[in-house]
Regions:
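Single conserved hydrophobic/aromatic residue that forms the stacking wall/gate
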Residues: 1-8
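Broad gene-expression machinery/nucleic-acid interaction feature
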Residues: 4, 68, 112
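A general structural signal for short secondary-structure junctions and capping/turn motifs
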Residues: 6, 32-34, 60-63, 105-108, ...
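Dual-mode signal for accessory low-complexity, basic/Gly-rich regions
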Residues: 15-85
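Extended hydrophobic packing segments that form well-structured cores
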Residues: 93-135
Length: 135
């Protein structure tokens, strides 16, 4: 059976979290520091990606996470800011990034996942349907 997780995010902060297994651990992780309650990474990967279709397990998170959509709680990657490499925590924050002592990835992708965003006027905008990008 799949483990179920739910997070309520308001004003870019996780305000509530539930898990069918490991909820106590999840809540302790969220209490690590203020940045632990914010997303540090969101990666949308279609279920049909070559790595996903390979069926291989590399036993290395940096490779395996690319087989599925995933999110990370905590620290963002400062190298993702255009033209920047070694930013301080305050510089990361000034650019809208998140600082934390943790960075915990978890895979959320599958051929069943639907992902929606919200437009400027609050309308729901489909992004993924059944694990694939919406055209």
């Amino acid at each position: 059976s799949r483990r179920q997780r739910q997070m309520c995010i308001r004003d870019s902060r996780i305000t509530d979290a539930k898990a069918s297994k490991g909820e106590t651990v999840l809540k302790k992780v969220l209490e690590s520091d203020e940045g632990a309650r914010r997303l540090g990474e969101v990666a949308l990967v279609p279920n049909s990606s070559p790595i996903s279709n390979s069926g291989l397990l590399f036993y290395n998170t940096l490779f395996d996470e690319n087989a599925a959509s995933h999110i990370a709680l905590g620290q963002c990657y400062s190298k993702c800011f255009k033209g920047e490499k070694n930013l301080s925590a305050s510089e990361i924050s000034e650019r809208g990034g998140n600082s934390s002592m943790i960075h915990i990835d978890w895979m959320i992708g599958s051929g069943e996942i639907d992902i929606d965003g919200f437009g400027k006027n609050g309308e729901i905008v489909p992004i993924f349907r059944k694990g694939e990008w919406v055209d």
